[in-house]
Amino acid sequence: MLTIALPTGRSLDNCVKILETAGLPVEKLKDAKRNLVIEEGVYKYLLAKPTDVPYIVEWGGASLGIVGNDVTEESNARLVHIADTGLGKCVMAIAAPEESLERYEIAGNAKNLAGLRVATKYVHLAERTFKELGIQIKILKLNGSIELAPVQGIADCIFDVVQTGATLKANGLAVVKETLDVSLHVVARESAVEINEPLFAKTVMAIKNSL
Ligand code: PRP
């Protein structure tokens, strides 16, 4: 049996599509209801919070995982990258209230932005990204509804994932800078890659060939 960790929420439909296209059984997975562990044929699927998928794979709870590279970049889990599925495309971006956009001419303006208050749930990725931009920031860690922070004036901007842009627009925010292309990636546990059991190898090959 091979265990694969999958993210709950808006990415799950794309994950089902990836597995189905690769020829893996997904009938029960499509009808998971509140079940967190679904066994189908020789596969066991685990349904986890997206941010937990990298750690579940790293700690050996699953041999494979599918998760956005926004999440793997934020985590410090040791994983082997298997493939970029190209599905679930979105971007990491800095966004700010529309009326404040003039402030953010990032190139050459880093000093003026020193002390910028950034709301995000991606603390590590934000630290790295703003460091690369040469901007010293203060981070307000939130766990969701990040857009609230600039709307309420408790942060100057947000650093978050943007898919359709609808949430930004609805809250009077606009993209200042896109910093990372994001999509769903297949990742594996290091030891699973080293051991490379037949079912693991066959599954990895099937997924790669179907992309
Ligand atoms: C994410 C993200 C944005 C939104 C972007 O939140 O944090 O709020 O999606 O998507 P859009 O560009 O299509 O509007 P999510 O829905 O995962 O919920 P959260 O606010 O609880 O993190």
Which sequence ranges carry the predicted segments?
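Domain-level signature for soluble enzymes in the chorismate/prephenate branch of the shikimate pathway
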Residues: 1-211
